[in-house]
Design a protein with these regions (language model features):
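Structured-RNA-binding interfaces characteristic of tRNA pseudouridine synthases
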Residues: 1-247
Length: 247
């Protein structure tokens, strides 16, 4: 039987989602907890990979097993007793056997947070900017993502992507306080480091390091070296993974 598990985590102390040698990962912690409770070695498949220090408010994964020997809510409770305090499970649900955490996802939404003044309480979860930014221009530039498909310019060099085509359905800067903004972007898929490179390039637009014409050239020429730098991962949150559940 196949089960989906929905959870969130603070990525500060993890080297990303995926298991890797000699480094702590969220996948490792989740598999360890499931293996203890179900009394056999478990493998979980995530909706995607988050990099070192990146957070997730609502991540999804699946695992296969015989019917779990308890109610899903009880499994959630017991998992949260075992897992570290920076990982929280919200829901476990049985799904159709063909549902796949990664390949059945129809959308993913990320938020990237910026503070325009120094804030000691947000320093671990946002990028703190000391220079002025023109968010109106940044939003104007972001709208071009809705009509563009090839994101080679924002893909980490040497990646293993078979294609750099992504379908972006939302891209905008949203202000939540006089000094707090976040960039929201939704797409069917993302390339490695894509969101952080997109944010870095939009910041270059906002601080007028590049013109709108130069931004459009970057968008269309596909050269990673021309785009902005990849922003730090601590301000990036995987906000939601969308599925079309039939039940």
């Amino acid at each position: 039987m196949r089960y989906f598990i929905f959870f969130g985590y603070d990525g500060t102390n993890y080297h990303g989602w995926q298991i890797q040698p000699n480094a702590n990962s969220v996948q490792q912690e989740l598999q360890r907890a499931l293996s203890i409770l179900l009394r056999k070695e478990m493998e979980v498949v995530g909706a995607g990979r988050t990099d070192t220090g990146v957070h997730a408010r609502h991540m999804a994964a699946h695992f296969d097993t015989d019917r779990i020997p308890m109610e899903p809510d009880q499994l959630v409770y017991r998992l949260n007793r075992i897992l570290p305090r920076d990982i929280a499970v919200y829901e476990v649900r049985e799904v159709a056997p063909e549902m796949h955490a990664r390949f059945s996802a129809i959308s993913r939404t990320y938020h990237y947070y910026i503070h325009t003044r120094k804030d000691p309480f947000e320093r671990h979860y946002s990028l703190q900017i000391s220079y002025p930014l023109n968010f109106e221009k940044m939003n104007e530039a972001a709208q071009h993502f809705l009509h563009h498909e090839d994101y080679a310019a924002f893909c980490k060099a040497g990646g293993d992507n078979k294609t750099t085509i992504c379908h972006v359905t939302a891209a905008r800067w949203i202000q939540t306080s006089p000094t707090t903004w976040y960039f929201e972007i939704t797409a069917n898929r993302f390339l490695r480091n894509m969101v952080r490179a997109v944010v870095g390039t939009l910041i270059d637009v906002g601080r007028e390091k590049i013109t709108m014409e130069q931004f459009l050239d970057i968008l269309h020429n596909g050269s990673r070296s021309d785009a902005g730098e990849s922003m730090p991962g601590n301000a990036l949150f995987l906000e939601e993974v969308g599925y079309d559940f039939k039940d």
